[in-house]
């Protein structure tokens, strides 16, 4: 019978987006379908918003983003002045980030 320790082996690692040049990949997605094309369009819209000094960028967060490994991406967006405000569900801030701050990990 499987035990808890059998499932808690692979710790989720937060991606450091600055270590990857994803621009060519996201640009190529413009000619794809469904979510890939949507990601390209969203990236272009965000780029336009960031360049517009009169535009306020509000980042909305919901779901298991931090426990899925995206905490550093959000952190980098904040540190690089890519967002002006954040609207988040409580689970992201309280549960996911707080547990990691206490030294717990996501698997």
Segments predicted by a language model, with ranges:
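Metallocofactor- and cofactor-centric catalytic cores in central/energy metabolism, strongly enriched
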Residues: 2-107
């Amino acid at each position: 019978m499987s035990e808890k320790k059998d499932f808690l082996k692979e710790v989720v690692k937060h991606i450091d987006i600055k270590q990857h040049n994803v621009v060519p990949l996201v640009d190529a997605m413009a000619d794809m379908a469904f979510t890939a094309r949507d990601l390209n369009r969203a990236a272009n819209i965000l780029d336009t918003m960031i360049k517009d000094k009169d535009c306020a960028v509000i980042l909305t967060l919901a779901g298991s983003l931090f426990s899925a490994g995206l905490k550093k991406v959000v952190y980098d967006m904040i540190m690089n002045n890519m967002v002006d405000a954040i609207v988040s569900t409580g689970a992201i801030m309280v549960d996911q980030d707080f547990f990691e701050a206490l030294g717990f990990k996501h698997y």
